[in-house]
């Protein structure tokens, strides 16, 4: 598809008509309020695909009771500007009735990787994620779909779903984009003041402390966690949900093994805002992490 202004489409029929021609299609699923992290996904798709489809849909089925669905930031004009600058061809912006019409009754539940950590803290969250992602994959039928590594467990859930259900798509993980402070970019950062965002970078510092302990030879998971917990204890406003060292199947173990998918994940509430982050632990994956984009 020749590069022109990004087209905004709201119906499934419009999307399928626009994608009727030949060429590799890349999908970037988002909930909107785009930032540089999303732009990195779009640029990666642009470099690898002939047509890039960005979806913007605040999916109600992945929000729990008393979560922030009603106040989740929305700004389609801002999203369109980011999409065009990064190189998206199509912006698919369906409403809830398009994605979940009257009588809709199907939910996708991915076992195993979806159950601990975020799955335990936010019951039903990954069912909503898996359901909407599978719908988007069926609507767009891309060769590749791009997800940020910041949502590491979500990436694992999507990969497992695609594998188990034989969906013909390659799932591409894109490294986390961070502020110079180390804070992982997130649409929910908009809830925080600049001072609060600076203090929220303690999550990144805690993860780095765990990495450093592992690099020094520590293999006991409890002691690795303690290195991170000691950093988090410096912030009086933090309400920690979890700090976990997990393998590729999201399982916590007593000792770190030589698994390239070993990851350190953290979730906490700071100033009333729930934030998540993660970094790789193994040397090979850590070298990849050192090449993460930064929002400078």
Curated annotation (Swiss-Prot):
It is an enzyme of class 6 (ligase). CDD domains: PanC. GO terms for molecular function: ATP binding; pantoate-beta-alanine ligase activity. It is found in: Cytoplasm. Pathway: Cofactor biosynthesis; (R)-pantothenate biosynthesis; (R)-pantothenate from (R)-pantoate and beta-alanine: step 1/1. The keyword Lyase does not apply. (R)-pantoate binds at residues 62, 154. It holds the Pfam family Pantoate_ligase. Its main location: cytoplasm. It catalyses: (R)-pantoate + beta-alanine + ATP = (R)-pantothenate + AMP + diphosphate + H(+). Its EC number is 6.3.2.1. Beta-alanine binds at residue 62. SUPFAM superfamilies: Nucleotidylyl transferase. Belongs to the pantothenate synthetase family. Homodimer. The reaction proceeds by a bi uni uni bi ping pong mechanism. Catalyzes the condensation of pantoate with beta-alanine in an ATP-dependent reaction via a pantoyl-adenylate intermediate. This is Pantothenate synthetase. The gene is panC.
